[in-house]
C-alpha cells in the first residue's frame, strides 16, 4: 500500500462521532448561570472549545458560546485564566 493510502485508511478508522454531552445529561437549553456545565466547554486557557472537540450540534454550540459570553459579562466565568 502506498503511504498516502495508508494514511487515509488510518484516518478513516480513527474517526468516530463524539457523544453529545448535553443530550447525555438531558439538557435542552444552556443557561449562563450553570457554571459547572459551562466549565466543560472552556479550555484551561479560558477559550471556548470547538464543536469538533465537544461534539455539540451547531445550535447547541451557539447556545454554549452565548451562555459563556453572558457568564463572563456577569463575572461568573473569567475572561482568561493564568
From Swiss-Prot:
Chain intervals for the UniProt region annotation (Disordered): 1-24
Any Pfam family matching the protein: Ribosomal_S18
Coiled coil regions in record: none
Keyword vocabulary terms for this entry: Ribonucleoprotein, Ribosomal protein, RNA-binding, rRNA-binding
Alphabetized SUPFAM superfamilies for the sequence: Ribosomal protein S18 (SSF46911)
GO MF, one annotated term: small ribosomal subunit rRNA binding
Function: Binds as a heterodimer with protein bS6 to the central domain of the 16S rRNA, where it helps stabilize the platform of the 30S subunit.
Subunit structure and binding partners: Part of the 30S ribosomal subunit. Forms a tight heterodimer with protein bS6.
Stated name of the protein: Small ribosomal subunit protein bS18
Amino acid at each position: 500500500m502506498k503511504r498516502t493510502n495508508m494514511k487515509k485508511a488510518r484516518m478513516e478508522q480513527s474517526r468516530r462521532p463524539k457523544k453529545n454531552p448535553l443530550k447525555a445529561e438531558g439538557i435542552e437549553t444552556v443557561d449562563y448561570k450553570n457554571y459547572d456545565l459551562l466549565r466543560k466547554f472552556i479550555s484551561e486557557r479560558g477559550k471556548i472549545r470547538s464543536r469538533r472537540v465537544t461534539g455539540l450540534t451547531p445550535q447547541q454550540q451557539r447556545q454554549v458560546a452565548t451562555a459563556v459570553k453572558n457568564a463572563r459579562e456577569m463575572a461568573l466565568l473569567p475572561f482568561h485564566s493564568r
